[in-house]
Amino acid sequence: MRTVVLLAALLISFALPAGATDVAAAQKVIRAQEQAFARNDAAAAYSYAAPAIQEIFPDAEIFMQMVQQSYAPVYRHQSFEFGEAKVSDGYVAQRVQIVDENGEAWEALYTLEEQPDGSLRITGCSLLKAGQAV
């Protein structure tokens, strides 16, 4: 039985690309924040922001106002789909394709950093209209 479990673990580890668990964890954090925005739950949305972001926006309501004003497609949208991701030494960069409430396409690039407790938190989000040069 122990051999079967070990074999299964080895097969799973070869089936997943390097960093796949980090990408899955990052996507879970981003999705949880997106859902918090949808519920207008400022405290929950704020909890996924890294400490450096929380220093800039020291209150959940201030953070939520900033997102509403500067990241409207992230705050409210028709679709929110994960794209390519990159993992490097405790950091994850995750692209997200967004269609806003008006039907306009956007691309967001989220960055996340591993925290001392092992969790990932969002360190930033860059937002461009789809097709716009960086």
Describe these PLM feature segments.
Residues 5-15:
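Bacterial N-terminal signal peptides
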Residues 9, 34, 52:
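Generic anion/oxyanion-binding catalytic loop in active/binding sites
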Residues 13-39:
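Short, low-complexity N-terminal intrinsically disordered segments enriched in polar/charged residues
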Residues 24-28, 42-89:
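Short solvent-exposed beta->alpha transition segments
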Residues 32-36, 59-64, 122:
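A generic structural signal for ordered secondary structure
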Residues 84-134:
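Exposed beta-sheet edge and beta->alpha loop/turn motif
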